[in-house]
Amino acid sequence: MPSLRSILRKTLHRCVHRFGFRLVRTPPFERALRNWELDHQPFYFVQVGAHNGITSDPFHRFLIENLAWESILIEPQSPCVNTLHAIYADRENIRIEHAAIGSGSSKDALSSPASNTLTLYKVSDAAVGLPHWANQLASARREVIASHKDRIPDIERWIETQEVPCMGLAQIVSKHGFPRVDLLATDTEGFDFEIVKQIDDLPSLPQFVYYEHKHLSPQEYSESLRFLHERNYRTHQVNNGDTFAQLR
């Protein structure tokens, strides 16, 4: 016999379907963001490794829907930067930075020459016959790109290097005059903990941190969790590859 909860759920679904809608369970991380932004507008968002702003991007919908998000999208690959400019050309609240975030303290970068660069390992733009997601593969760590050999057997022949502008996280945040960062998101193919560690250099700790852990070693991932827990964050895995952290 169906439970009362099951009966109520089906009844509610039928009601909304009649009006052309459907009910979808919102992921916990999204509920946390939605609740926070109601009382914190503008909401300050920094995304490191924005790629093209669409593919596998959990925050694209937020940016499209919400004019209250003051955002900095940081991306080192030129073709992706061009795409970001095209998508958000009419959005003054969204800034695009053609740069990579280096390792080490952002405070050091504040006094470093603007000509600092980072060596980026990426799949060549001229590569043919590869999966559609291959152009997302760009990292400061060559071994992370090469590790996709199980799905792209000849990936070694397509790996190339590119020198890209390199800045510190705090340097970029300061450049755009953000008084704080509410959400820091990073997806940099294995370089993510190096970026997360730079939250100590920001004006205050971000309320939320969302980072890709899939390409971190078990030791690095453990260290990243300890780092966040020591700063009073609660953490949980969003899926098999990402972690969401929220200040207590």
Describe the function of each predicted region.
Residues 1-248:
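Phosphate/nucleotide-binding beta-alpha loop and adjacent structural elements of enzyme active sites
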